[in-house]
């Protein structure tokens, strides 16, 4: 009898611990993390976006992925993870240190790192091209190309204050889009093909 109770308790704990269920990442906490990251990005604003109109650029955020209609659960989690990883890398460059208030930047990095750790416990293996529902394009490659375009833009603009402001606004947009995919995953229990 004690063994059966211990086994039941272990199963209950596994279902609530990281890696034990989809809910390990898609709980209320990540929504708070996203809000905090958006708040930090907003506070990092040093220039009026209107003063940088001439530097605006469409980076081609892959909407078909962040909307989630064409992704399976594992792919969606991998896309969320890759977008977080790339965002973390972007704000962890030497050039980003020169562009932002170091206290706010460090808080943002810490928040992104915590989200990466939380999501890493829940995602499955990275999906490859042959598993992709987006045709011949691997979703992870698409995310990497999107961020490479951002790095190229920053370099082309000499890491100017306006270039960083445009990228800051783009990261807020991308973070909001990622939240849409995350909410959809949570709502559908990971089945993105359900209504």
Swiss-Prot record:
SUPFAM superfamilies: 4-helical cytokines (SSF47266). Residues 1-23 form the signal peptide. It is found in: Secreted. Constitutively and exclusively expressed in the mononuclear cells of the extraembryonic trophectoderm. GO terms for molecular function: cytokine activity; cytokine receptor binding; hormone activity. GO terms for cellular component: extracellular space. Pfam families: Interferon. Its main location: secreted. InterPro entries: 4_helix_cytokine-like_core, Interferon_alpha/beta/delta. Glycans are attached at residue 101. Keywords: Antiviral defense, Cytokine, Disulfide bond, Glycoprotein, Hormone, Pregnancy, Secreted, Signal. Disulfide bonds join 24-122, 52-162. Coiled coil: none annotated. Belongs to the alpha/beta interferon family. IFN-alphaII subfamily. Paracrine hormone primarily responsible for maternal recognition of pregnancy. Interacts with endometrial receptors, probably type I interferon receptors, and blocks estrogen receptor expression, preventing the estrogen-induced increase in oxytocin receptor expression in the endometrium. This results in the suppression of the pulsatile endometrial release of the luteolytic hormone prostaglandin F2-alpha, hindering the regression of the corpus luteum (luteolysis) and therefore a return to ovarian cyclicity. This is Interferon tau. It comes from Ovibos moschatus (Muskox).
């Amino acid at each position: 009898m004690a063994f059966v109770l211990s086994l039941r308790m272990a199963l209950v704990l596994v279902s609530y611990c990281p890696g034990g269920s989809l809910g390990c990442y898609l709980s209320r906490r990540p929504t708070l993390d996203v809000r905090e990251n958006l708040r930090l990005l907003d506070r990092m604003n040093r220039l009026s976006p209107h003063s940088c109109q001439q530097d605006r650029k469409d980076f081609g955020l892959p909407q078909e992925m962040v909307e989630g209609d064409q992704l399976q659960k594992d792919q969606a989690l991998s896309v969320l993870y890759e977008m977080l990883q790339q965002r973390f890398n972007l704000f962890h460059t030497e050039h980003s240190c020169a562009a932002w208030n170091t206290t706010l930047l460090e808080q943002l990095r810490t928040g992104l790192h915590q989200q990466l750790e939380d999501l890493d416990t829940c995602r499955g293996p990275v999906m490859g091209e042959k598993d992709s529902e987006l045709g011949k394009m691997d979703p992870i490659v698409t995310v990497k190309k999107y961020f490479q375009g951002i790095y190229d833009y920053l370099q082309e603009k000499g890491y100017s204050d306006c270039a960083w402001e445009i990228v800051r606004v783009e990261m807020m947009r991308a973070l909001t889009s990622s939240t849409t995919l995350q909410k959809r995953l949570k709502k559908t229990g990971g089945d993105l093909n359900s209504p």
